[in-house]
Design a protein with these regions (language model features):
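Conserved N-terminal entry element of GNAT/NAT acetyltransferase domains
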Residues: 1-12, 152-153
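Acetyl-CoA-dependent GNAT
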Residues: 5-8, 16-87, 98-100, 104, ...
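Residue-level detector of beta-propeller blades
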Residues: 66, 129-131
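Conserved G/P- and acidic residue-centered "switch" motifs that form tight phosphate/ATP-binding loops
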Residues: 92
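C-terminal "cap" of GNAT-fold acetyltransferases
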Residues: 108, 113-120, 131-153
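Conserved active-site tyrosine of GNAT-family acetyltransferases
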Residues: 122, 127
Length: 153
């Protein structure tokens, strides 16, 4: 597996991976209406590209195929997105991305808003639960969890 820096031409593929992953992997924890509100299929590619460029963004590739991505705001330590292709779950891709993204930080704490589905992954990586949250997307309420992890330097 190759971890590499994000390139603007990756954006459409990452948006598709995001949509496919949410609708397949997260379907065990969220209702169809929640999945549709979370991943509508109409991502603003310009806004996503700007966000990826403003953050440290890594792309995971396996045999030339994009199989995951993640991005983190290095100034605040906020892990914004971490997604692995629905067909490549459980292969250590999220762990590799998360570790590499955390390694780029000089702040003492990393934090994220984890889905119900991702919560066990983050607990296993040393994050602690701060609070359960209800967020609204397109008029639909979703549950997620603010989680944080101190970085030992």
């Amino acid at each position: 597996m190759l971890l590499r820096a994000y390139r603007p031409e990756d954006c459409p593929a990452l948006a598709q991976l995001f949509y496919d992953t949410v609708h397949a992997v997260n379907a065990r924890d969220y209702a169809p209406a929640q999945l549709d509100a979370w991943a509508t299929g109409t991502v603003d590619l310009c806004a996503w590209n700007a966000s990826f460029l403003a953050h440290r963004t890594l792309v995971a590739q396996l045999e030339g195929q994009i199989v995951g991505f993640g991005d983190i705001d290095v100034s605040s330590g906020y892990l914004d997105r971490l997604y692995v292709h629905k067909d490549f779950q459980g292969r250590g891709i999220a762990t590799a991305l998360e570790g590499a993204l955390e390694g780029a930080l000089s702040v003492p704490l990393v934090y994220t808003d984890a889905s119900i589905t991702a919560k066990p992954f983050f607990l296993g990586r040393g994050y602690r639960l701060v609070r359960e949250q209800r967020v609204e997307r397109h008029g639909v309420t979703l549950t997620n969890f603010r989680m944080e992890k101190p970085l030992l330097r």
